[in-house]
């Protein structure tokens, strides 16, 4: 699966443009601009599986660091503060990782 199978390349480019500078990544803005927030729950979970590098069923901080690069290989890494903020926004049960349901809830919140 390629991310452009479910999201428009133009929307992805626009979303990445908005957060190209360090410490400018805002999850909800990214989800809105990329079109992710308009997708169904099952489509969002498909994107989650694409982002889940090790197919563990969870996203950890290491995977979140490379979140933007899953949308475009040349995109920057998230900063440590952006990574921790993204984790805090989605990790509802406080286990230090984001499951598919938590990811979907964050995207649609």
Curated annotation (Swiss-Prot):
It comes from the Eukaryota. Keywords: Acetylation, Calcium, Metal-binding, Repeat. The modification N-acetylserine is found at residue 2. It holds the Pfam family EF-hand_7. Ca(2+) 1 binds at residues 52, 54, 56, 58, 63. Abundant in the organ of Corti. GO terms for molecular function: calcium ion binding. Ca(2+) 2 binds at residues 91, 93, 95, 97, 102. Residues 39-74, 78-109 form the EF-hand domain. CDD domains: EFh_parvalbumin_beta. One of its GO terms (cellular component) is cytoplasm. Has some calmodulin-like activity with respect to enzyme activation and growth regulation. Binds two calcium ions. Belongs to the parvalbumin family. This is Oncomodulin. It comes from Cavia porcellus (Guinea pig).
